[in-house]
Amino acid sequence: MFLLTGYEYFLGFLLIAAAVPILALVTNLIVAPKGRTGERKLTYESGMEPIGGAWIQFNIRYYMFALVFVIFDVETVFLYPWAVAFNRLGLLAFIEALIFIAILVIALAYAWRKGALEWS
């Protein structure tokens, strides 16, 4: 019987993680239609005829809101496991989390002061 221990599991998962996307791409190349002509080149707008060009400029404020959202979304991803294991981590982890939150509050204050959160 073949037993995997230690790094063999990691190597197995790494090979599978590399093989699945490659297999998906190769399957797409084999199965997908080859040519795009006529109506297949048009963009899709809810079954309606496309109006105007596909390349339009968006206001930079959308980018700033998205950037601030991503920053605080990542904050939530890092703080959730800390909150779940709060009782077992102790005082040092609490102080580290406070420093992390303080850095993010400073970043929020900076964005607010620069006007990144105002829509005018």
Swiss-Prot record:
Q: Where is this chain's protein located in or outside the cell?
A: Cellular thylakoid membrane
Recorded topology in the membrane = Multi-pass membrane protein
Query: Cellular component per GO?
Result: NADH dehydrogenase complex; plasma membrane-derived thylakoid membrane
Broad class of where this protein is predominantly found: membrane
- Which keywords does UniProt give here? Membrane, NAD, NADP, Plastoquinone, Quinone, Thylakoid, Translocase, Transmembrane, Transmembrane helix, Transport
Give the catalysed reaction(s), semicolon-separated. Answer: a plastoquinone + NADH + (n+1) H(+)(in) = a plastoquinol + NAD(+) + n H(+)(out); a plastoquinone + NADPH + (n+1) H(+)(in) = a plastoquinol + NADP(+) + n H(+)(out)
Q: What does this protein do?
A: NDH-1 shuttles electrons from an unknown electron donor, via FMN and iron-sulfur (Fe-S) centers, to quinones in the respiratory and/or the photosynthetic chain. The immediate electron acceptor for the enzyme in this species is believed to be plastoquinone. Couples the redox reaction to proton translocation, and thus conserves the redox energy in a proton gradient. Cyanobacterial NDH-1 also plays a role in inorganic carbon-concentration.
Its name, as the record gives it, is NAD(P)H-quinone oxidoreductase subunit 3
> What is the originating organism of this protein?
Prochlorococcus marinus (strain MIT 9312)
Query: What high-level taxonomic lineage is stated for the organism?
Result: Bacteria, Bacillati, Cyanobacteriota, Cyanophyceae, Synechococcales
Q: Which gene encodes it?
A: ndhC
